[in-house]
Amino acid sequence: MHGLPGGGAEMLVEDVRKDVSPKKGHPDNWLRVMKEAQLLGLTTSATNVIGFGETNADRVQHLRRIREQQDEVRKLNLPGFTSFIAWPVQLESNTFGKRNRGQNKFERGAGPTEYLRHVAISRLFLDNVDHIQASWPTMGMGIAQMALLAGADDAGSTMMEENVVSASGTTKFSATEFELQLSIHRAGFLPVRRNSDYDRLDTPDALAGSPEAMCQPPLHAVELV
């Protein structure tokens, strides 16, 4: 076992968790498990779901708890969280969204503008987390391109199989390497392959000879798996 993904964090604020998902564990438990994994030398990531009706202060509290734990682990010369990924709660045609609409004290949902603002704030606030990932499976390629301009430097992976976002009713849960490279290139960046530790790998030019890739020269490297 090499790593432990950071899914399940959602919102590390107890009042929000109790209202939205009372059967899930306390936020402290998520942080404890991730810290144990980090102390064992496993590669870990941190996640955040917004749009539960939480306040801006709740969102900052989530970021603060991640940053504080990252500070503790970095003092031990360990990498801690290699990346941070946020996305809005998915309320499309799934039973979760239908069942809870109007049933909670929180009004749910977060649009593209709110998401992009959160990406930008995350990049500024989490100064000790090296990489911010854009969430194209939940936001689509167009918004993911804008997220790269808002502070994200990682486009994630092609995801040959995905069972969480797809179950929520969204339709875009896989992409070819050509699609990812093209989106990154059109946003003005250079696509670069990586592994889960963010070591850069040889990157074949999936756009070679493609007229669709004719645009401005790339400005900065963007990671992709």
What kind of region is each of these model predictions?
Residues 1-42, 49-73, 99-110, 170-171:
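Conserved non-cysteine loop/helix-boundary elements of the Radical SAM core domain that shape
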Residues 8, 44-50, 83-88, 136:
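A cross-domain feature marking catalytic cores of carbohydrate-active enzymes
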Residues 63, 71-225:
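Auxiliary Fe-S-binding modules of radical SAM enzymes
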Residues 2-3, 43, 82, 153:
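Short acidic/polar active-site loop segments enriched in Thr and Asp
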Residues 5, 45-47, 154-158:
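Short hydrophobic alpha-helical runs that function as membrane-insertion/retention elements
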